[in-house]
């Protein structure tokens, strides 16, 4: 059993052949989320993976109501083992936005962002953690298209992207969907820069 310690949290990862191991992108999103989240908030993490970011929030903030979604069954089990309430589904599917309890103050997403051709796909469930389609933005664009319906008035999203993903392209998409987009965290790592973009409903 692989475990990671991060501040107050010890994360159980299980089989890393099937579950993405938290790395610099996960840590940067967790740091940004800790600054944005407040007690009493309703928070949704989409594509929670091992549950790392959600577990960090639960360990550090009182009285938050947190739900997560995850498509990978191995990762969903891992998130549950880390104390996260998780629904196994694709993005928002199955969450009905017309119900008040399914509107959130803050929605988090660390999408797969590597530009990936058919020949570059990884076998098995782990592909969902990396494969951003040809542009690297395919899953992110689906998320952005749907996110507004799940936010409370004045709600915010935090998305982790890479310089590979194209910051200006992402900001333009967010603007076209009614979000004010601001960079709130960034970190240079190896061949890329990791960036957290906050989108606030206008």
Model feature map: region roles:
Residues 1-202:
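Auxiliary N-terminal substrate/complex-recognition segments of SAM-dependent methyltransferases
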């Amino acid at each position: 059993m692989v475990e990671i310690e991060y501040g107050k949290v010890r994360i159980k990862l299980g089989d890393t052949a099937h579950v993405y191991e938290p790395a610099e992108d996960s840590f940067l999103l967790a740091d940004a989320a800790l600054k944005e989240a407040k007690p009493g908030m309703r928070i949704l993490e989409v594509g929670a993976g091992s549950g790392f970011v959600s577990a960090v929030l639960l360990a550090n903030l009182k009285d938050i109501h947190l739900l997560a979604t995850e498509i990978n069954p191995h990762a969903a089990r891992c998130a549950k083992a880390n104390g996260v309430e998780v629904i196994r589904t694709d993005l928002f599917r199955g969450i009905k936005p017309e119900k008040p309890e399914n509107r959130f103050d803050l929605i988090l997403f660390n999408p797969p962002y590597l530009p990936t051709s058919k020949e570059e796909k990884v076998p098995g469930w782990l592909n969902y953690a990396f494969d951003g389609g040809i542009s690297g933005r395919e899953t992110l664009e689906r998320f952005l298209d749907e996110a507004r319906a799940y936010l409370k008035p004045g709600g915010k999203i935090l998305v982790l992207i890479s310089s590979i993903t194209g910051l200006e392209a992402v900001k333009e998409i967010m603007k076209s969907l009614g979000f004010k987009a601001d960079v709130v965290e960034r970190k240079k790592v190896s061949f890329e820069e990791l960036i957290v973009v906050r989108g606030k409903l206008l």
